[in-house]
Regions:
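Sec-dependent signal peptide cleavage junction
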Residues: 15-34, 98-99, 105, 309-316
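Functional-site microenvironments in short loops/helix caps that host divalent-cation chemistry
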Residues: 24, 44, 125-296, 311-315
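Residues within well-ordered beta-strands of beta-sheet-rich folds
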Residues: 66-71, 156, 301-303
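Short, structured beta-strand segments at or near domain termini in extracellular proteins/domains
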Residues: 298-309
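A short glycine-rich, aromatic-capped structural motif
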Residues: 28-117, 123, 141-148, 259
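Bacterial Sec-dependent N-terminal signal peptides
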Residues: 1-20, 179
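Residues embedded in well-ordered beta-strands
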Residues: 36, 187, 299-301
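Phosphate/oxyanion-binding loops and surfaces in catalytic or ligand/nucleic-acid-binding neighborhoods
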Residues: 83-87, 186, 264, 305
């Protein structure tokens, strides 16, 4: 199920960005990748209610943080899993391990039904495991990951970097939304309302529905005809996500904030931004996907945030 929280970013004011230790940045890059700064912001948001009216204005102040420029990759997640095994943390490993069998959860999407055999396929059993283990896919986003695994990954990264003044976590929905907007108030992370450039080059990885199969009713409702196997095709023709660092970055230097894989946030069972299996309307910054199990459409990325002094004291 997908639903949307539409919001308007009305104003903002940025303040100072906390500095990072060079040793931390080096360790991060070795373990998971590069983090980019997301400045502190004060802004007002309004929900668009179900009846189309604007809800009350709410003031927010987000402290500055850093965000991983890509989704967490298979390479980074496998490093984490292998370290859990090396430490003998078998219970944590079982909680966090990939669930490649969940590729089957998208085989009910009739958009990929083979017109000759009638079979509905995405990846073969062998290919499902190759997506996890093959060097070909090591820089692709880690998917079919449990929420508990993503949380453990963040805790593991915090331990490995080892700076008590910083911690790694899943972003809140608000953190993620502001970072995805790249300092703008548009509905897509690259800015503006468009999914493709004027020459047809895609800005995002998403499920492209050919215009031929979209009609409008007398009441103005759009209807998509999925009865023909040629009516829908994936962007660039793939049946898997794309490399975590692909296409262009947004204004903050973040890749694939809309599309490719929907991303977990700190709120369990919620993923945002849409995926490679969602049509363009469902990969907006405010798109929300509910989930109850690991999914080939869902991955995650990590933020680094400064720990408050009183929190550090409390851990001693």
């Amino acid at each position: 199920m997908i639903f949307w929280l539409m919001a308007m970013l009305l104003m903002f004011a940025a303040t100072a960005q906390p500095k990072r230790a060079k040793a931390d940045v080096k360790k991060e890059k070795e373990l998971v990748g590069t983090f980019v700064p997301i400045p502190e912001q004060s802004f007002t948001m309004q929900d668009v209610l179900e009846d189309g009216t604007l809800g009350p204005k709410v003031e927010y102040n987000l402290p500055a943080f850093y965000m991983l420029e890509t989704e967490v990759t298979n390479k980074a997640y496998n490093l984490f899993l292998n370290d859990l095994k090396a430490q003998g943390r078998t219970d944590d490993y079982e909680k966090a391990r990939f669930r490649p069998e969940n590729w089957s959860t998208i085989e009910t999407v009739k958009w990929y039904q083979d017109p000759k055999s009638g079979k509905i396929t995405c990846l073969s059993d062998t290919a499902r495991y190759q997506y996890i283990t093959s060097p070909t896919f090591e820089l692709y986003p880690a998917v079919n990951v449990p929420y508990e695994g993503a949380v453990l990954f963040c805790q593991w990264l915090t331990e490995k970097v080892g700076n008590p003044e910083w911690e790694y976590a899943l972003p809140s929905q608000l953190d993620w939304t502001w970072a995805a907007a790249g300092g703008k108030g548009d509905v897509y992370s690259m800015g503006g309302p468009f999914l493709r450039a004027a020459d047809g080059t895609p800005y995002y990885h998403y499920l492209h529905v050919d215009d031929t199969w979209i009609t409008r009713t007398d009441s103005g409702l759009h209807v998509v005809d999925l009865s023909n196997d040629k009516s829908v095709h994936l962007n660039m023709g793939f049946h898997i996500p794309y490399p975590a660092m692909s296409l262009r970055a947004n204004g903050y230097g973040l890749y694939n904030m809309c599309g490719n894989v929907a991303e977990m946030v700190s709120n369990p069972n919620m993923a945002v931004g849409g995926s490679w299996l969602d049509p363009g309307y469902d990969i907006r910054i405010y798109s929300i996907k509910e989930y109850t199990q690991p999914s080939p459409q869902i991955g995650f990325r990590v933020i680094a945030r400064k720990v408050k002094k009183e929190e550090i004291e409390g851990k001693k």
